[in-house]
Amino acid sequence: WKLGMNGTFAWTPSINKGEKRSPADQSVGKQLPYVPKYSATLTGRLTYRSWSLLYKWCYYSERYTMTNNDITLTGHLPPYFMSNVTLEKGFSLRWADLSLKGTVNNLFDEEYLSVLSRPMPGINFEFFIGITPKWGKKKR
């Protein structure tokens, strides 16, 4: 058995440092639209022989939708959390290494927006098959 964990944290102060384009321009000195100021991930992996179970948790802070950073009904997107889980099985064949992987994205069926008025998918599933040929390697 092997247990591994890692995480990331990003502080992204994406500030408009340009010049005002007009007297009404309120964007200078403000966070750029759709860029979360904070984001974080935490990943845990449990491995046993050729099996691997991965859990990934993600956080994205509030994002503004307008350059003036107004917090109105349509001027910002709320923060959200996301959880994904993956189960993977590896196989070693004479001619290739094979990987079968199934993922459940948005495990808890969270409602969230990455862009205003564009709902993102609820719970969804992915299946992957990976083949790594062993060309040029001696077969035993």
Language-model features: locations:
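C-terminal beta-signal and adjacent terminal beta-strands/loops
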Residues: Y59-T67, L87-R140
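Residues that define the transmembrane beta-barrel architecture of outer-membrane proteins
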Residues: Y34-A40, P79-S83, P121-F125
